[in-house]
Amino acid sequence: MSTYFLKLYVTNMTPKIEGSVEKLRQVCDQELNGEYDFKIINILENPQLAEGDRVLATPTLIKELPTPVKRIIGDISNTEKVLFGLDLLKKD
């Protein structure tokens, strides 16, 4: 079982989002030692999931586990800021 669970809500996978996701996965592999699950959800295909998580804008990245739940809305291209905002940076 993974220690971290992340969900990314998107409207569609643009090249910018794809690049940000790849970079985020690489950093999570390094920072979280690969102990995470990462799910990408297209709100056009699964609007009920977005409604359940109260997603009002895309992209929205949600860290569900470990608690507390945290979210980043908007640009996810700066992975360091994203990891800091989600409280995922390793403590040195």
Regions found by a protein language model. Name each.
Residues F38, L49, T79-E80:
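Domain-scale activation on soluble regions of proteins
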Residues T58-K70:
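A short, hydrophobic beta-strand/beta-hairpin element that forms part of a small beta-sheet core
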Residues I76-D92:
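Ser/Thr/Gly-rich flexible loops in soluble cytosolic domains mediating phosphotransfer, phosphorylation
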Residues E51-A57:
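Thiol/disulfide oxidoreductase modules built on the thioredoxin-like
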Residues M1-C28:
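Local sequence-structure signature of Cys/Sec-based thiol-disulfide redox active-site neighborhoods
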Residues R25-D37:
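Conserved helix-turn-beta segment immediately C-terminal to the redox Cys motif
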Residues G34-N46:
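Thiol-based oxidoreductase modules, predominantly thioredoxin-like and allied folds used
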